[in-house]
Regions:
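Feature captures the catalytic ectodomains and active-site-proximal regions of enzymes
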Residues: 2-543
Length: 543
């Protein structure tokens, strides 16, 4: 466990008034008519609402605590996908989007939508960073490498964005373009890559530009937990041409399937071609993923001065590296679509009132309760304590350890709440999402039951402290683990997510969205939400 406690209060904030009771006539009071602290927001990642069935691990699991909370407390459902979280209609939500909307208290229009709009109105093809990247490759007679997730999942990348990159390269007369395709199988069906690769091949044929270089499962190319041994395999394929070999992209996938590998786990494979597709000195690389967390490590391997994650060999290539969005500010790389940070997010408001706040998660979801929850701000706010609990590293996938680090997360959360004067806490339980992605229903059931046990411990302490738990999820996953044909579904769902408030004298209004959680927390804390927050309190007085 690592902790980071940043003390401080807004100018003029009285010391030690975290638990002061405001004037009863204050319109900021919660529907219960009293301030309740601490408010603990529990995000049960990947726990959606769906009819019971053989593919719904949520309904299959024994969750007596969750069931009791639903029976005894105000509850309802929230929208967590599509326009309700700033995504296109029908697009499933994800952890980044979910936590951003939760913490911001408003619908935050996502990079997926923003980039797609730029393509539609033509601004994409005038983007200075992208045009300059193409100009460098064309002017030097070097290769433009387009790397990223080739997937229709819409969680980390978008097929239309890659096609637009290829079109831009053709317009800018880049003669050598290589697509390094990372395969999905988590946010798409486990063996769906061949269709996506064929779609991109058709685009390359129509434009007369581009060829495939390396085919790799995201397990290797898109790790986010510093498992550098995995990333090294992808890097070595890209730079040194090491790994499996195949005549073309389709053959690479066929061979992987014969080895028993689904898309996510395809070992890095070099597509044999007449021209060398390796990344070399003077080349230009564009990572086209719009979501940063799983693009960051491979980017660091190419662009971080003094990189020490693994041995990159005697001569790592000196390249111009460009990213679609900002993956890591400290790298100082050109970014095609810089971040647009919402202001006056929940963490900011709490800091401005001199209130202490606690953010807890295991490694897999740590960025979500910090960076994303705080509106894309990396540094902690005043009075913010962060606790990171390491995710298990002794298993290849979490179906082998479905409890993950949930019990450790709970231990740290309870110890901090019992020993500190926190007004607010947010905690993420990663299990339903991370184990749901494995497609192993029995493991997902065990994961949910572990979270339910932790839920009971947290609610018990918070109730004893006089506080309120807000129980919800950022998106669905474990609620939809089978396709209609009986094959595994490892992607997120577009189902509604639960919302439970352990508050008395209130009921949950209908039509809620994730962006309504921050205003709800502020109301329970007796604070007025800022005008930038356009969400609304989910609780209203009982009749």
């Amino acid at each position: 466990m690592t902790g980071e406690d940043v003390a401080g209060a807004a100018p003029g904030a009285p010391a030690g008034d975290c638990f002061a009771t405001p004037d009863p006539g204050d319109p900021a009071l919660s529907p219960t008519g009293r301030v309740q602290r601490p408010v603990v927001l529990m995000v049960l990642d990947g726990w959606g609402c769906a009819p019971a069935g053989p593919g719904n691990a949520v309904s299959l699991a024994r969750t007596p605590v969750f069931d009791r909370l639903v029976a005894e407390h105000p509850h309802g459902t929230l929208e967590a996908s599509g326009p309700a979280v700033g995504l296109p209609p029908g697009q499933m939500g994800n952890s980044e989007v979910g936590h951003l909307n939760i913490g911001a208290g408003r619908v935050v229009h996502q990079d997926l939508t923003r980039i797609s709009k730029a393509i539609a109105d033509g601004d994409f093809f005038r983007n200075r960073v992208l045009v300059q990247a193409c100009a460098k490759a064309a002017g030097r007679g070097r290769t433009l490498h387009l790397m990223g997730l080739v997937s229709g999942g819409g969680v980390h990348s978008d097929m239309g964005h890659l096609k637009a990159c290829l079109e831009l390269a053709a317009r800018e007369k880049v003669s050598s373009v290589v697509v390094h395709a990372f395969l999905d199988g988590r946010d798409t069906r486990p063996r769906s890559a061949k269709g996506y690769l064929a779609e991109i091949q058709q685009t390359m044929d129509e434009l007369g530009v581009g060829r495939f270089g390396v085919i790799s499962g995201r397990y290797y190319a898109m790790d986010r937990d510093t498992r550098w041994d995995r990333v090294k395999l992808a890097y070595d394929a890209l730079v040194y041409g090491r790994g499996f070999f195949a005549a073309d992209a389709q053959a690479a996938v066929d061979a992987a399937y014969k080895r028993g590998e689904s898309d996510e786990f395809v070992r890095p494979t070099v597509v044999a071609a007449e021209l060398d597709a390796r990344v070399a000195d003077g080349d230009v690389c564009l990572f086209f993923n719009f979501r940063p967390d799983r693009a960051r490590e491979l980017t660091r391997a190419f662009a971080e001065p003094g990189f020490a994650g693994f041995d990159r060999g005697s001569h790592p290539p000196a390249v111009d590296f460009v990213t679609m969005t900002s993956y890591k500010k400290e790298l100082g790389l050109p970014v095609a679509f810089p971040p647009e940070h919402p202001i006056n997010v929940l963490a900011d408001v709490l800091a401005a009132h001199g209130l202490r706040q606690l953010h807890v998660a295991e490694t897999e979801k740590y960025a979500h309760v910090t960076f994303f929850f705080n509106g894309g701000v990396e540094a902690p706010f005043a009075g913010e304590t962060r606790i990171l609990v390491p995710s298990p590293r002794d298993v290849p996938t979490y179906d082998h350890k479905p409890a993950m680090s949930a019990f450790g997360v709970t231990d740290e959360l309870l110890a901090a709440l019992a020993g500190g004067d926190f007004a607010f806490a947010v905690v993420n339980y990663a299990n339903a999402d991370m184990v749901g992605h494995t497609g192993v229903i029995s493991a997902a059931v065990a994961a949910l039951e572990a979270v339910d046990e932790c839920l009971g411990r947290v609610v018990e302490l918070v109730t004893r402290l006089g506080g309120v738990c807000l129980v919800t999820a950022d998106h669905g996953n474990a609620d939809h683990m089978l396709e209609p044909d009986g094959s595994p579904n490892t992607a997120h769902s577009t189902n509604l997510v639960p919302f439970i408030a352990t508050a008395e004298g209130a009921r949950v209004r209908e039509g809620g969205r994730l962006c309504d959680l921050a205003p709800t927390a502020l109301a329970l804390l007796g604070l007025v939400q800022p005008p930038e927050m356009t969400g609304a309190d989910l609780l209203e007085p009982s009749p």
